[in-house]
Amino acid sequence: MKKTLLACLVFLSLNVLASKPKHQFVRISTDRGSCVVLLYNQTPQHRDNFVKITQEGKLSGTLFHRVIKGFMIQGGDPDSKTAKPGQALGDGDWGYTVPAEFRDSLFHKKGVIAAARDDNPLKASSACQFYLAQGKVFTDEQLDLLEQNRLKRKIPTWQREVYKTLGGIPHLDQNYTVFGEVVQGIELIDTVAAVKTGAADRPVEDVRMTVTVLKKKEAKKLEKKLRLATQP
């Protein structure tokens, strides 16, 4: 009897584990639209931290406080929750950083989410401030000049093709940790990037966000749709 019960418990436990999605997703919602972001398993410290602060409600209610068309939209500053109109933002944090997790395969194509940071030698990331990359489309000539004058390295051929079609921000590669990408609603980036801004690139009209972690059922459904279930 005990062996049968133990076997049943093991079977149920395996089923529960098997039913868990292999990836974490978050939804960023604003009054101008929403998007869903896949958090990369290749950057586990950033993934886990972003899930943690999202579940704790630390991101919901913050603003996209820095918006530069053709570059990126930045948010997550805790000070922005109660910021007055025109107040300078960008220095708020939660008192800790996340170690850099640079990966050669993860780069600043349009639609990625990456961690903002201050000017520190280890390039450690802010625990809360992040940006969604918009960037621009490049030509081969522009990428060649960027390699020679700024990067001092070669951009992999397959990444060049992405920068020439989808676009992005290649000069930020290996300087700011990329830890996910928008898989639904990428048009939100263009919408927010187009808003009127004032001093310090802050939108004249607040763009406030609500950030939530997708529940297991929805995450598994999205994995299947994106054919991610068998990927790391």
Where are these regions (language model features)?
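Cyclophilin-like peptidyl-prolyl cis-trans isomerases
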Residues: 16-232
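Sec-dependent N-terminal signal peptides
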Residues: 4-12
